[in-house]
Structures are given as C-alpha cells and as structure tokens.
Amino acid sequence: MLAELLPGHYSNANQAYFDTRRGLPEQARHGLLDVVITPLEDSSEPGREFSWREKGAESRLVLTTSGDDPVGIRAAFETRKDGGWRTDPTRVLRILRSAGGFTGTGPGGLRLQVSARELWLDPGNGDPYWLERSREFHCYADIPGVGGGRDDCAHAHQGVGA
C-alpha cells in the first residue's frame, strides 16, 4: 500500500506563497520545495526502492520489513558515496500505517507523513513542510485562427457601434 502512495510529484508552492503573503520573517518561511518520487526501474526488489529527487539532488529510498517488527516498515534514505549507495543514519524512519496514510519517525525528530493527497516532511525542527501531490492534466487551448479552427471571434464585433 505504501509503495502505491509514494510515487508522484509533490510541491509546497501554496505553503511557500502564503508564508510570504502573511509577511513571515525570512527565517520562519518555508522555501519552495519540490520532491519527485519514482519507483526504480532497475530495482532488485520492485515496489521497495524509489528515486527521491529534492533540490536537484537524488537519493534512494529503500523500504524493508522485518520479522522483528511485524507492523513497522523501515525506510532508509541512501546517498551516493564513493561510487555506491550508502545509508544515511540520520534519515532512517520507522513507518506505521495510520488513518488514511502512513506516518514515519526517525532520529532527531525527523518525521514523514504520506497520504493520497499530500506529503509532510519535518526535518526535526517541529515546523514541517506541507507538500501537496501534483495532479496531471491536459489543457487544449482553442486559439482563433490557429490549428484549422474558424476565426469568427475576429469578425464578431465588426460594425457594432456603441
């Protein structure tokens, strides 16, 4: 279930915008943060390893379960080091199922919460980033005179006087 919820593009554009609009001091504002999570295609364990892109840097998020913890999921962030992937001990979480999603806790107050619509990230300072899941959509604009459409709009008001 967690493996189905995680993939997507998340952004805190609303949070960053309203922090500025409310006039919060610079040090209290949440900067714009975009996170893209995708399943790793070359994973030896599909549904267990993900690419996590944040601020132009890529990490791997590896999910594992253990018989020692029948209800928790271990989520470890790995960073590239010395030509390979190494677990960052400051970014290892224990994730549990909660109402409508999953909640993870880690060292130093690190917290992560994911649901169908959002991702909350707290680096440990108690002031989390609220990232909303982006929705993909297509927009087809009808521009008069372009693409073979009729150009009626340009002539609709000819001869109309006030």
PLM regions and their residue ranges:
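Calycin-type beta-barrel ligand-binding domains and close structural analogs
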Residues: 3-9, 13-23, 32, 47-162
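Short secondary-structure subsegments characteristic of cysteine-rich extracellular domains
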Residues: 27-41
